[in-house]
Amino acid sequence: MRRKDRENNSPEFFELVFDKAEIINIAFRDEPFPYCLPFNFGKIENKIYIHCAKEGRKLDLIRAHPEVAFNLAIDIRIDREKYTTYFKSVCGTGQASLVEDPAEKAAALDAIGEKYAALCPRPSPMSLLNRVSVIKIAILSLSGKNCEPRED
């Protein structure tokens, strides 16, 4: 990171951003350009979970190239007088895979529902498990950046 004064790689910072972020943007490897999409997500330990339809482009891309990149940002505020934006962000890389184990799939969907306080039954019913795909991203690297107003 070029701006070492803004770097924040503490586990507490990572947890803060993951807890408060409402959306995660995930870039999948495609040709000639990456394919980047926003998702609701859940996190269990060092794994990110998203859900999607049972077929589609992202699943095809994961099967061909499971390496992904992602980013999350919170506390975004534009200061027009100072021509800057304040934020806390985390960028990372990971290895994506399709979750096949019903227990892990249910836990992932429960984590997503819990994060968004969804009014859905928990534990997730088997009928839901059969209707959706769940993707697991095993986190390989994280990098945090914190741009806050300075006390002058």
PLM region spans:
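Active-site-adjacent structural patch at catalytic or cofactor/ligand-binding sites
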Residues: 53-54, 64-77, 86-96
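Short beta-strand segments
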Residues: 21-54, 70
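Anion-coordinating catalytic cores for phosphoryl-, nucleotidyl-, and glycosidic chemistry
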Residues: 5-6, 15, 57-60, 70
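Short glycine/proline-enriched turns and hinge-like loops at secondary-structure junctions
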Residues: 34-36, 62-63, 83-84
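Short, intrinsically disordered, mixed-charge
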Residues: 19, 64-68, 110, 114-118
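Extreme N-terminal tail/first-helix region
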Residues: 1-20
